[in-house]
């Protein structure tokens, strides 16, 4: 269908469900960061993202269309299971570092990735680890993506008995 047949509006490319999940993961990391740094509550941040950010334009930046249920599942699951997630992350760090020493964005990435490894058995470990390493690359240029890869890989081995292949 041409633009003219569509009322003159250009057609929007469809977003594949996998890409919507990736966008939901990125948004979840951003929401978890916002909660960690700003002290925002889970209900407030989820409502804000669903109403004003997911698939919307904010201050000239267009947020990708995201799977809202995937986003909600990650954010609320990390908050609900944080007492289970944080010890796993701490034990996977090579040195005895408290999570508070990690950058808040790295903390959010590791918590979200760990939640998915624990809860989303339908998603292969390789997909989870790769997605969160890519999110780390969007924020960092140096060692942080390697750290995310190593920590999530160790957690996957411990929890699922498998590593990223």
UniProtKB/Swiss-Prot annotation:
Keyword terms of this UniProt record: RNA-binding, Transcription, Transcription antitermination, Transcription regulation
InterPro entries listed in its UniProt record: NusB-like_sf, NusB_fam, NusB_RsmB_TIM44
Signal peptide: none
A GO molecular function held by the record: RNA binding
GO biological-process terms attached to the record: DNA-templated transcription termination; transcription antitermination
Renumbered residue ranges of the record's region Disordered: 1-20
GO cellular component: cytosol
Gene3D superfamilies in UniProt: NusB-like
Assigned protein family: Belongs to the NusB family.
PANTHER family tied to this protein: ANTITERMINATION NUSB DOMAIN-CONTAINING PROTEIN, N UTILIZATION SUBSTANCE PROTEIN B-RELATED
Physiological role: Involved in transcription antitermination. Required for transcription of ribosomal RNA (rRNA) genes. Binds specifically to the boxA antiterminator sequence of the ribosomal RNA (rrn) operons.
HAMAP family documented for this protein: NusB
Protein name, UniProt field: Transcription antitermination protein NusB
Organism of origin: Agrobacterium fabrum (strain C58 / ATCC 33970) (Agrobacterium tumefaciens (strain C58))
Species lineage: Bacteria, Pseudomonadati, Pseudomonadota, Alphaproteobacteria, Hyphomicrobiales
This protein's encoding gene: nusB
């Amino acid at each position: 269908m041409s633009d003219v047949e569509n009322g003159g509006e250009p057609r929007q490319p469809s977003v594949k469900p996998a890409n919507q999940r990736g966008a939901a993961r990125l948004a979840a990391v951003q929401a978890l960061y916002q909660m960690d740094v700003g002290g925002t509550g889970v209900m407030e941040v989820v409502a804000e993202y669903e109403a004003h950010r997911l698939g919307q334009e904010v201050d000239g930046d267009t947020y990708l269309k995201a799977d809202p249920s995937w986003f909600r599942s990650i954010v609320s699951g990390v908050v609900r299971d944080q007492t289970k997630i944080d010890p796993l992350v701490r034990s996977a760090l090579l040195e005895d570092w408290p999570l508070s020493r990690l950058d808040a964005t790295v903390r959010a990435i590791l918590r979200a990735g760990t939640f998915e490894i624990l809860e989303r058995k339908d998603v292969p470990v390789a997909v989870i680890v790769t997605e969160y390493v890519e999110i780390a690359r969007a924020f960092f240029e140096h060692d942080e993506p390697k750290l995310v890869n190593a920590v999530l890989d160790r957690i996957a081995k411990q929890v699922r008995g498998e590593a990223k292949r």
